[in-house]
Amino acid sequence: MCALSLAEDAMDTPADDPAAAEEAPAVQQSARDAFIDGIIETGRQLYVKANGKLQRAQYAGDIYVCKNFTVHVFRENCARFRMAEYPGVALKIPNNLPKEKCKPHSYGYCWEEVTAAEGNPFYIAAQFLYDSSLSKQENMEKALEFMRQVRRGDYFQMSAEYYYGVGAHSAIMIADYDPETDTVHWMDSNMAGEKRDGVRYGKVQFDAVKEISWWAEAFCKKTRGATIYRLRDDIILAEEPLPEEPLP
């Protein structure tokens, strides 16, 4: 992890000395953690603003469409940050891989391939694709192990068949996988919702929690899968924040 600055340890003072606790400088937050905090806080604010009411999630410019929500909270925060390897390159988040390029898998399990040199600060931390050569149980075991890789700040992209529908969904994990409860916590928009006069309205969620088996059962289906995208460790503060790129 690339820290902005780290406090030096008080090597010569006993750990139980009260004076040491008062004098020891605090460890400053890393730029990467600050970026993740900003993304999560922006999502929380949108959740609070929605106040439990469904938000329009129908049109390309609606930020409450699931993918748009995750892109929006990224763009609201990314101008302040860069990658140490490419300090002059503004950060960008890739679009989903087009349907034709997903074949033989179903649309929605992954993003387009955009290099770090082009501004993509994410890498694939884990990926699951249903393997028809294995049994359903074997696939489920792999899907569960995949879900155990979740860490705070991860972007989660899946192609699913589950209670809320069939197709692509995007979410952001707001905590590490919890092995004690076998759960993950996330935020998203439009996983649940309804249509009103032909227009889709979606629910904004923050600190939603489910056992990993719930998620695995959603995407552990033939042709489907999911990918965990994680911010690189070399996130730094930008020396001169650039204006955000306009929406396509």
Regions found by a protein language model. Give the residues of each.
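Boundary at the C-terminal end of the N-terminal hydrophobic targeting segment
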Residues: 5-7
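A detector of low-complexity, intrinsically disordered, Ser/Thr/Gly/Pro/Ala-rich segments
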Residues: 9-11, 181
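N-terminal capping segments
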Residues: 12-120
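Alpha-helix termini
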Residues: 80-83, 178-182, 217-227
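...with weaker cross-activation on analogous glycine-rich loops/strands in unrelated enzymes
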Residues: 91-195
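Low-complexity, Gly/Ser/Thr/Pro-rich intrinsically disordered linker/tail segments
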Residues: 188-192, 198-248
